[in-house]
Each structure stands twice: as structure tokens, then as C-alpha cells.
């Protein structure tokens, strides 16, 4: 089944952009980035910015990100995928990253949430951004929670 990504959550103040791959089924139903309760994205990011993002509504989460100059988007505009595994994404359409220069002129750092999105790191690096590939926030990745948490925290130290 072909799945559509979400529009970017960025503005002229965005300095850090986190790129995922493509929303999963639960996120699409909720129309929310990282909408699956088993995904640790909001817990990880909340611990980094010092806010309990897990316990507030989605709109307030996005506002907290903007206050902290953090944006969200996905590498893929659309793609076919059965279920939620990134390894099953096929026939993907890549987002137009060229719009970032105008939409987020202060963007400096692009973080990739997991291996699949990280495959596109060279494109953003070639555009002049500092880049880093992070361990995925997926709940399926919990066995490495400690190293994942420290890796995410380290990426935000600038």
C-alpha cells in the first residue's frame, strides 16, 4: 500500500532537523509524527530538551520543538510499505530537500532517525549541513536503549 508522508514541521528559526523515513500505520491514522505509543521518539527528545513531551498533546509537542529550534520531516514524500518496518519500504519518492534553504535558512544540523533515513545523509551533507545518523527511536530498538539515549543526547550537544 502506498503511504504518504507529512509536511515538514520547520520554520525560519529551525536550526536542527530530525529526518525519519516514512510514517507508520498508527502515525498515519493519527496524522502525527511518531504517533505510535511504542516509539521512543518523544521520550528521547523530551529528555534532551528537558520537557515531558510524552504527557502533552501533539500540538504542544510541536510547539515545544519549535521553541527549541527543532524541526521534523521525513526523507520520503511517499512509498509503498506493508506494516511499519523501514526495510520494507519500496518505490519511495524522496522529499525535495532544496526547499530547506528557503524554509529554514538557519538550519545547521540534520539528524537522521535510523539507518533507512541515514542512507540519504550524503545528500544533506553535500548541501552543506552538519549531519549525524542516530540509532532509531523505534520501540523495536529498545535493547540498545542506553546507547541510543546517549547517542541522541550527544548529537544535540553543539
From Swiss-Prot:
Record's keyword annotation contains DNA repair: yes
One GO BP annotation of this record: DNA repair
Record keyword DNA repair present: yes
Entry keyword set: DNA damage, DNA repair, Hydrolase
Superkingdom of origin organism: Archaea
Enzyme Commission designation: 3.2.2.-
SUPFAM superfamilies the record matches: Uracil-DNA glycosylase-like
Protein name per the record: Hypoxanthine DNA glycosylase
